[in-house]
Amino acid sequence: MNRGQADMKQPLLKLEQVEICYRRTPVVHGLTLEVAPGEILGIVGESGSGKSTVIKGIIGLLGNEGAVTEGKIYYKGEELLHGTPEELRNIRGPEMGMVFQNAGASLCPIRKIGDQLYEAVLQHERVSRTEVRRRAMELFEKMKLSEGS
């Protein structure tokens, strides 16, 4: 199979018995689902029910306090939970991302903006940390923010 092309016979996305923990506390239990190529999936639920946590687990944005601790996640037949950050970026590519339902809550208020921007760019682009830092500094200057923001 060519990377980046989904086989119409296999799921585009597949989760098998996924468990996600935050600070060692399980918050998502035994999640199993399949999304076929061309299929649309909507995740709905009450506030705090784990919608964003599931998406962050799939795309690898749980941060230092969260982790997928059980199960398997596949995208186009390739496992997303193992491999180097570079290998995982290549699998996910620019196709995976997250759209926040509340733009005001998109950034974590207790973490530095710069750290959050660095993580997002490093997660999805094939650039060096030096290049990420350079781009972030340009953005900070345009927004009249200091690097420590």
Where are the predicted features?
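Conserved structural motif at the start of ABC-family nucleotide-binding domains
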Residues: L13, V28-G30, I91
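Q-loop/switch helix immediately C-terminal to the Walker
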Residues: N102, P109-Q123, R135
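The feature captures the beta-strand-to-loop junction immediately N-terminal to the Walker
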Residues: V44-E46
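Conserved ABC transporter NBD signature motif
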Residues: A67-E79
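ABC ATPase nucleotide-binding domain
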Residues: K14, T32-E34, Y74
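ABC ATPase NBD coupling module
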Residues: L80-G97, Q123, R129
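Conserved ABC ATPase "signature" region
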Residues: E131-S149
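Helix-to-loop junction immediately C-terminal to a conserved catalytic motif
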Residues: I59-G63
